[in-house]
């Protein structure tokens, strides 16, 4: 089974903006109700421990349909909210090649 990963790294100009966006992002993900992909996608939202102005959103999806649906939703819902804050963004799309647990 293919596992797709998307890592979004956002760096804001203040911790307050970062905290505000994290809260808004949590609420947007909780409110998103795309039943056709609900079991195919998840997100981990993290605040950087060393830089309080930086956060990550790590999306895991089981197929391209889930990523496509998320892309459409993100473009219409998430990005307009994020773009009201001054920020830098790095986005990495990847396919999981190994998972090691010890």
Segments (PLM) and residue ranges:
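A periodicity- and composition-biased signal for non-globular, repetitive helical segments
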Residues: 11-12, 88
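Glycine-rich beta-strand-turn "strand-cap" elements at beta-sheet edges
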Residues: 36-56, 78-102
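Short, well-ordered beta-strand segments in beta-rich or mixed alpha/beta enzyme
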Residues: 4-11, 41-74
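Short acidic, gly/pro-rich beta-turn/loop elements at beta-sheet edges
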Residues: 18-20, 67-69, 101-102
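Serine/threonine-rich low-complexity intrinsically disordered regions
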Residues: 17, 35-36, 62, 68, ...
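Short amphipathic alpha-helical segments
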Residues: 15-42, 74-82
């Amino acid at each position: 089974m293919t596992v797709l990963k998307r890592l979004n790294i956002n760096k804001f100009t203040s911790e307050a903006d970062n905290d505000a966006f994290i809260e808004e992002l949590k609420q947007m993900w909780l409110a998103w109700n795309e039943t056709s992909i609900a079991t195919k996608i998840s997100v981990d939202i993290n605040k950087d421990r060393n830089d309080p102005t930086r956060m990550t959103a790590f999306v895991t999806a089981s197929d391209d349909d889930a990523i496509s649906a998320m892309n459409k939703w993100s473009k219409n819902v998430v990005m307009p909210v994020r773009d009201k804050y001054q920020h830098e963004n790095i986005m990495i799309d990847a396919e999981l090649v190994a998972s090691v647990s010890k």
